[in-house]
Amino acid sequence: MPTTTDAASPARPRTGRTAVRAHASVRVERGPQGAPRLAELRSDVPIVLRMTGVSPVRTGARAGAGARADPGPLPTMTVHLVNGAAGPLAGDDLRLDISVGGGVRLVLRSVAATVALPGRGPGPSRLTVTAEVADGGELDLGPEPTVVADGADHQISTDVRLAATARLRLREEILLGRFGEPGGSILSTLRVDVAGGAEGPGADLAGGPFGWVPLLRQELLLGPQVPGLRGPAQLGGARAVGSLLVVAPAWAGAGPDAAVAEGVARLPLTGPGYLVSALADDAVTLRRRLTALADPTG
Protein backbone atom coordinates (compact mmCIF):
# COMPACT_ATOMS: atom_id res chain seq x y z
CA MET A 1 0.00 0.00 0.00
CA PRO A 2 1.24 3.51 -0.68
CA THR A 3 2.57 5.31 2.33
CA THR A 4 1.22 8.82 2.77
CA THR A 5 1.88 11.07 5.74
CA ASP A 6 -0.48 13.99 6.10
CA ALA A 7 1.16 17.31 5.31
CA ALA A 8 -0.40 18.85 8.40
CA SER A 9 1.60 16.61 10.74
CA PRO A 10 3.73 18.64 13.16
CA ALA A 11 7.37 19.37 12.47
CA ARG A 12 9.99 17.34 14.29
CA PRO A 13 11.49 18.68 17.50
CA ARG A 14 13.46 21.86 17.03
CA THR A 15 17.22 21.83 17.53
CA GLY A 16 17.28 25.46 18.69
CA ARG A 17 15.08 28.55 18.90
CA THR A 18 14.60 28.74 15.16
CA ALA A 19 16.25 25.63 13.71
CA VAL A 20 14.02 22.82 12.48
CA ARG A 21 14.72 19.45 10.86
CA ALA A 22 12.46 17.92 8.23
CA HIS A 23 12.75 14.82 6.04
CA ALA A 24 10.23 14.31 3.21
CA SER A 25 10.16 11.74 0.42
CA VAL A 26 8.34 10.78 -2.76
CA ARG A 27 8.54 7.44 -4.57
CA VAL A 28 6.80 6.69 -7.86
CA GLU A 29 6.61 3.25 -9.49
CA ARG A 30 4.97 1.63 -12.49
CA GLY A 31 1.70 -0.06 -11.55
CA PRO A 32 0.38 -3.42 -12.82
CA GLN A 33 -1.56 -1.77 -15.66
CA GLY A 34 1.32 0.50 -16.64
CA ALA A 35 0.03 3.62 -14.92
CA PRO A 36 2.31 5.49 -12.49
CA ARG A 37 1.71 4.48 -8.88
CA LEU A 38 2.50 6.63 -5.87
CA ALA A 39 4.33 4.20 -3.61
CA GLU A 40 5.27 6.81 -1.02
CA LEU A 41 4.45 10.46 -0.39
CA ARG A 42 5.73 11.67 2.96
CA SER A 43 5.54 15.32 3.92
CA ASP A 44 7.35 16.85 6.86
CA VAL A 45 6.64 20.51 7.60
CA PRO A 46 7.87 22.80 6.14
CA ILE A 47 8.24 20.43 3.15
CA VAL A 48 4.67 19.67 2.05
CA LEU A 49 4.14 17.43 -0.99
CA ARG A 50 0.91 17.13 -2.96
CA MET A 51 0.11 14.93 -5.96
CA THR A 52 -1.43 17.24 -8.56
CA GLY A 53 -1.79 15.14 -11.72
CA VAL A 54 -1.51 11.75 -13.41
CA SER A 55 -1.35 11.22 -17.16
CA PRO A 56 -3.09 8.26 -18.84
CA VAL A 57 -1.08 5.24 -19.90
CA ARG A 58 0.19 5.84 -23.43
CA THR A 59 0.18 3.00 -25.91
CA GLY A 60 3.70 2.08 -26.90
CA ALA A 61 5.42 3.70 -23.92
CA ARG A 62 8.22 1.37 -23.00
CA ALA A 63 9.38 0.45 -19.54
CA GLY A 64 11.83 -1.79 -17.82
CA ALA A 65 15.56 -2.21 -17.79
CA GLY A 66 17.49 -2.43 -20.98
CA ALA A 67 15.25 -0.21 -23.11
CA ARG A 68 18.08 1.89 -24.47
CA ALA A 69 16.19 3.83 -27.13
CA ASP A 70 14.15 6.91 -26.34
CA PRO A 71 11.05 5.49 -24.61
CA GLY A 72 8.81 8.21 -25.97
CA PRO A 73 6.08 9.76 -23.82
CA LEU A 74 5.92 8.00 -20.48
CA PRO A 75 3.00 7.70 -18.06
CA THR A 76 3.54 10.76 -15.87
CA MET A 77 2.80 11.73 -12.29
CA THR A 78 3.06 15.37 -11.18
CA VAL A 79 3.84 16.35 -7.60
CA HIS A 80 4.04 19.90 -6.25
CA LEU A 81 6.05 21.11 -3.29
CA VAL A 82 4.30 23.59 -1.01
CA ASN A 83 6.26 25.56 1.57
CA GLY A 84 4.47 24.95 4.86
CA ALA A 85 6.30 27.74 6.69
CA ALA A 86 8.48 30.76 6.04
CA GLY A 87 12.11 30.19 5.27
CA PRO A 88 14.28 28.19 5.46
CA LEU A 89 15.87 30.13 8.32
CA ALA A 90 19.42 29.91 9.66
CA GLY A 91 20.07 26.49 11.18
CA ASP A 92 17.18 24.72 9.42
CA ASP A 93 18.14 21.30 8.01
CA LEU A 94 15.74 20.05 5.33
CA ARG A 95 15.93 16.90 3.22
CA LEU A 96 13.93 15.57 0.26
CA ASP A 97 14.41 12.04 -1.11
CA ILE A 98 13.09 11.20 -4.60
CA SER A 99 12.80 7.77 -6.24
CA VAL A 100 11.50 7.07 -9.75
CA GLY A 101 10.90 3.53 -11.02
CA GLY A 102 11.28 2.19 -14.53
CA GLY A 103 8.79 3.13 -17.22
CA VAL A 104 7.33 6.17 -15.44
CA ARG A 105 8.02 9.89 -15.33
CA LEU A 106 7.88 12.12 -12.28
CA VAL A 107 7.42 15.86 -12.74
CA LEU A 108 8.28 17.69 -9.52
CA ARG A 109 7.47 21.38 -9.25
CA SER A 110 6.90 23.96 -6.51
CA VAL A 111 3.96 26.36 -6.21
CA ALA A 112 6.11 29.37 -5.33
CA ALA A 113 9.67 30.54 -4.90
CA THR A 114 11.64 29.53 -1.82
CA VAL A 115 12.96 32.49 0.18
CA ALA A 116 16.03 31.73 2.31
CA LEU A 117 16.02 34.10 5.30
CA PRO A 118 18.45 35.03 8.06
CA GLY A 119 17.63 33.79 11.54
CA ARG A 120 18.93 33.05 15.02
CA GLY A 121 19.73 29.38 14.46
CA PRO A 122 23.25 27.93 14.44
CA GLY A 123 25.03 27.91 11.09
CA PRO A 124 23.55 28.13 7.59
CA SER A 125 20.20 26.78 6.47
CA ARG A 126 20.51 23.57 4.44
CA LEU A 127 18.48 21.73 1.84
CA THR A 128 19.62 18.26 0.75
CA VAL A 129 17.96 16.60 -2.25
CA THR A 130 18.72 13.01 -3.25
CA ALA A 131 17.23 11.31 -6.30
CA GLU A 132 17.43 7.86 -7.88
CA VAL A 133 15.98 7.03 -11.29
CA ALA A 134 15.69 3.43 -12.54
CA ASP A 135 16.21 2.17 -16.09
CA GLY A 136 13.59 3.56 -18.43
CA GLY A 137 12.41 6.11 -15.86
CA GLU A 138 12.53 9.89 -16.01
CA LEU A 139 12.73 12.71 -13.48
CA ASP A 140 11.81 16.29 -14.39
CA LEU A 141 12.82 18.41 -11.39
CA GLY A 142 12.12 22.11 -11.87
CA PRO A 143 11.20 24.04 -8.72
CA GLU A 144 10.61 27.78 -8.71
CA PRO A 145 13.64 29.97 -7.92
CA THR A 146 15.44 30.12 -4.60
CA VAL A 147 15.60 33.73 -3.41
CA VAL A 148 18.50 34.43 -1.04
CA ALA A 149 17.48 37.37 1.14
CA ASP A 150 19.94 39.90 2.52
CA GLY A 151 21.81 38.38 5.47
CA ALA A 152 20.82 34.79 4.69
CA ASP A 153 23.37 31.96 4.47
CA HIS A 154 21.94 28.99 2.58
CA GLN A 155 23.34 25.70 1.27
CA ILE A 156 21.79 23.38 -1.32
CA SER A 157 23.18 19.90 -1.99
CA THR A 158 21.70 17.82 -4.83
CA ASP A 159 22.81 14.22 -5.47
CA VAL A 160 21.33 12.25 -8.39
CA ARG A 161 21.98 8.65 -9.42
CA LEU A 162 20.74 7.49 -12.80
CA ALA A 163 20.48 3.97 -14.19
CA ALA A 164 22.01 3.54 -17.64
CA THR A 165 18.82 4.33 -19.58
CA ALA A 166 17.27 6.79 -17.13
CA ARG A 167 16.49 10.36 -18.18
CA LEU A 168 16.80 13.58 -16.21
CA ARG A 169 15.82 17.21 -16.63
CA LEU A 170 16.96 19.33 -13.69
CA ARG A 171 16.55 23.08 -13.46
CA GLU A 172 18.00 25.31 -10.73
CA GLU A 173 17.40 29.06 -10.49
CA ILE A 174 18.83 31.43 -7.87
CA LEU A 175 17.94 35.07 -7.22
CA LEU A 176 20.25 37.18 -5.09
CA GLY A 177 18.02 39.29 -2.87
CA ARG A 178 14.39 40.28 -2.89
CA PHE A 179 13.30 43.36 -4.81
CA GLY A 180 15.40 46.36 -3.89
CA GLU A 181 17.77 44.58 -1.50
CA PRO A 182 21.25 43.00 -1.83
CA GLY A 183 21.51 39.24 -1.77
CA GLY A 184 22.77 36.91 0.91
CA SER A 185 25.15 33.96 0.56
CA ILE A 186 24.44 30.62 -1.09
CA LEU A 187 26.50 27.50 -1.81
CA SER A 188 24.93 25.10 -4.32
CA THR A 189 26.51 21.70 -4.97
CA LEU A 190 25.32 19.34 -7.72
CA ARG A 191 26.55 15.77 -8.23
CA VAL A 192 25.16 13.46 -10.92
CA ASP A 193 26.31 9.87 -11.51
CA VAL A 194 25.32 7.36 -14.20
CA ALA A 195 25.30 3.65 -13.40
CA GLY A 196 27.90 1.62 -15.24
CA GLY A 197 28.45 4.36 -17.79
CA ALA A 198 26.03 5.13 -20.57
CA GLU A 199 27.29 2.17 -22.58
CA GLY A 200 27.37 -0.36 -19.76
CA PRO A 201 24.77 -3.10 -20.42
CA GLY A 202 22.85 -4.25 -17.40
CA ALA A 203 23.69 -1.23 -15.27
CA ASP A 204 21.14 -0.54 -12.55
CA LEU A 205 20.72 1.49 -9.38
CA ALA A 206 23.20 -0.75 -7.59
CA GLY A 207 25.85 0.80 -9.80
CA GLY A 208 25.89 -1.84 -12.50
CA PRO A 209 28.87 -4.05 -13.36
CA PHE A 210 31.05 -0.97 -13.91
CA GLY A 211 30.09 0.99 -10.80
CA TRP A 212 29.09 4.64 -10.80
CA VAL A 213 30.48 7.00 -13.42
CA PRO A 214 30.51 10.72 -12.57
CA LEU A 215 28.64 12.78 -15.15
CA LEU A 216 28.69 16.21 -13.52
CA ARG A 217 30.26 17.88 -10.49
CA GLN A 218 29.30 21.52 -10.07
CA GLU A 219 29.73 23.91 -7.16
CA LEU A 220 28.44 27.48 -7.15
CA LEU A 221 29.28 29.98 -4.40
CA LEU A 222 27.58 33.37 -4.45
CA GLY A 223 27.48 36.15 -1.90
CA PRO A 224 29.09 39.35 -0.68
CA GLN A 225 32.11 37.41 0.59
CA VAL A 226 33.09 36.29 -2.94
CA PRO A 227 35.88 38.53 -4.34
CA GLY A 228 34.99 40.18 -7.63
CA LEU A 229 31.47 38.76 -7.72
CA ARG A 230 30.11 41.85 -9.44
CA GLY A 231 33.01 42.07 -11.86
CA PRO A 232 32.75 41.22 -15.57
CA ALA A 233 34.39 37.82 -15.03
CA GLN A 234 31.53 36.68 -12.78
CA LEU A 235 28.01 38.11 -12.45
CA GLY A 236 28.52 41.66 -13.61
CA GLY A 237 25.20 43.34 -12.95
CA ALA A 238 23.13 40.13 -12.99
CA ARG A 239 21.24 39.01 -9.89
CA ALA A 240 19.67 35.84 -11.35
CA VAL A 241 21.74 32.70 -12.00
CA GLY A 242 20.46 29.41 -13.36
CA SER A 243 21.27 26.09 -14.97
CA LEU A 244 19.39 23.35 -16.80
CA LEU A 245 20.84 19.84 -16.97
CA VAL A 246 19.48 17.35 -19.51
CA VAL A 247 20.52 13.69 -19.43
CA ALA A 248 19.26 10.98 -21.80
CA PRO A 249 20.67 7.86 -23.52
CA ALA A 250 20.21 9.62 -26.87
CA TRP A 251 23.19 11.83 -25.97
CA ALA A 252 25.50 8.95 -25.04
CA GLY A 253 27.39 9.23 -28.32
CA ALA A 254 27.90 12.59 -29.94
CA GLY A 255 26.39 15.26 -27.73
CA PRO A 256 24.67 18.41 -28.96
CA ASP A 257 26.71 21.25 -30.36
CA ALA A 258 27.87 23.94 -27.99
CA ALA A 259 25.92 27.17 -28.36
CA VAL A 260 26.15 30.71 -26.99
CA ALA A 261 23.59 33.52 -26.97
CA GLU A 262 23.09 36.66 -24.89
CA GLY A 263 23.52 35.67 -21.25
CA VAL A 264 23.33 31.92 -21.87
CA ALA A 265 25.52 29.02 -23.03
CA ARG A 266 24.97 25.33 -23.76
CA LEU A 267 27.87 22.92 -23.23
CA PRO A 268 27.91 19.18 -24.01
CA LEU A 269 29.14 16.89 -21.23
CA THR A 270 31.50 13.94 -21.46
CA GLY A 271 28.60 11.54 -21.15
CA PRO A 272 24.91 11.34 -22.06
CA GLY A 273 23.88 14.93 -21.47
CA TYR A 274 24.43 18.66 -21.70
CA LEU A 275 24.29 21.70 -19.42
CA VAL A 276 22.69 25.08 -20.10
CA SER A 277 23.87 27.97 -17.88
CA ALA A 278 22.48 31.50 -17.83
CA LEU A 279 22.66 34.91 -16.15
CA ALA A 280 19.98 37.59 -16.12
CA ASP A 281 18.69 40.65 -14.31
CA ASP A 282 15.44 38.97 -13.25
CA ALA A 283 13.73 35.59 -12.96
CA VAL A 284 11.56 35.95 -16.06
CA THR A 285 14.52 36.68 -18.33
CA LEU A 286 16.53 33.89 -16.72
CA ARG A 287 13.82 31.30 -17.41
CA ARG A 288 13.47 32.51 -20.99
CA ARG A 289 17.21 32.22 -21.62
CA LEU A 290 17.42 28.72 -20.17
CA THR A 291 14.46 27.60 -22.26
CA ALA A 292 15.90 29.09 -25.45
CA LEU A 293 18.84 26.66 -25.52
CA ALA A 294 17.18 23.75 -23.71
CA ASP A 295 16.27 21.84 -26.88
CA PRO A 296 19.24 21.46 -29.26
CA THR A 297 16.97 19.97 -31.95
CA GLY A 298 14.56 22.92 -31.90
From Swiss-Prot:
> GO MF terms on file?
nickel cation binding
Tell me the compartments it is located in: Cytoplasm
Organism lineage reads as: Bacteria, Bacillati, Actinomycetota, Actinomycetes, Frankiales
Q: What does this protein do?
A: Required for maturation of urease via the functional incorporation of the urease nickel metallocenter.
- In which family does this protein belong, per the annotation? Belongs to the UreD family.
Signal peptide position in this chain? none
Q: How does this polypeptide assemble, per the annotation?
A: UreD, UreF and UreG form a complex that acts as a GTP-hydrolysis-dependent molecular chaperone, activating the urease apoprotein by helping to assemble the nickel containing metallocenter of UreC. The UreE protein probably delivers the nickel.
Name where it mostly resides.
cytoplasm
Q: Which InterPro entries match?
A: UreD
Give the CC-aspect GO terms.
Answer: cytoplasm
Q: Which domain of life is it from?
A: Bacteria
What's the protein called, per UniProt?
Answer: Urease accessory protein UreD
Q: Which keywords describe this protein according to UniProt?
A: Chaperone, Cytoplasm, Nickel insertion
